């Protein structure tokens, strides 16, 4: 296998959707900061949903993007929480992996606090080959050839080999 065919974790996005702004969102931001060690950014509603009481442009969640060592460390901890089991449906055709963690109290060092409650989160892992930057760079941007994109089977093999995940 050539160096350009080595798969690596580009980023890990940790998202906590609260569905409303206010005190619950502030608590969620504090939890994400404690768990990941980074300050989260707020996510806003793309459209109005009257059934849920959500207005377009209102903050309804928070997320953190982890890269390099922080991403590696977090993904190891998160996979331990879900007992290193993933379903094939959690991999998409472009090699991304997504799974949920039901309770923040499953993380080491976190305990239940009745004033905060229990929050769940989504974890999205983006896998890429080296050289994928040509599709995102600002100077001399190029399209990525199909064989230079990670597919579902390669993503499953990468996670099984490097993180001992059962699929």
From Swiss-Prot:
Alphabetical keyword list: Ribonucleoprotein, Ribosomal protein, RNA-binding, rRNA-binding, tRNA-binding
The keyword Ribosomal protein belongs to this UniProt entry's keyword annotation: yes
KW RNA-binding (keyword) present: yes
GO biological process: translation
InterPro entries membership: Ribosomal_uL5, Ribosomal_uL5_arc, Ribosomal_uL5_C, Ribosomal_uL5_CS, Ribosomal_uL5_dom_sf, Ribosomal_uL5_N
PROSITE patterns reported for this sequence: RIBOSOMAL_L5
Signal sequence, renumbered to the chain: none
GO CC, one annotated term: ribosome
Pfam families (UniProt xref): Ribosomal_L5, Ribosomal_L5_C
GO molecular function terms listed in the Swiss-Prot or TrEMBL record: rRNA binding; structural constituent of ribosome; tRNA binding
Role played: This is one of the proteins that bind and probably mediate the attachment of the 5S RNA into the large ribosomal subunit, where it forms part of the central protuberance. In the 70S ribosome it contacts protein S13 of the 30S subunit (bridge B1b), connecting the 2 subunits; this bridge is implicated in subunit movement. May contact the P site tRNA; the 5S rRNA and some of its associated proteins might help stabilize positioning of ribosome-bound tRNAs.
Family (UniProt): Belongs to the universal ribosomal protein uL5 family.
Subunit structure: Part of the 50S ribosomal subunit; contacts the 5S rRNA and probably tRNA. Forms a bridge to the 30S subunit in the 70S ribosome.
NCBIfam families from the UniProt entry: PRK04219.1 (NF003258)
Protein name, as recorded: Large ribosomal subunit protein uL5
UniProt source species: Methanoculleus marisnigri (strain ATCC 35101 / DSM 1498 / JR1)
Protein encoded by which gene: rpl5
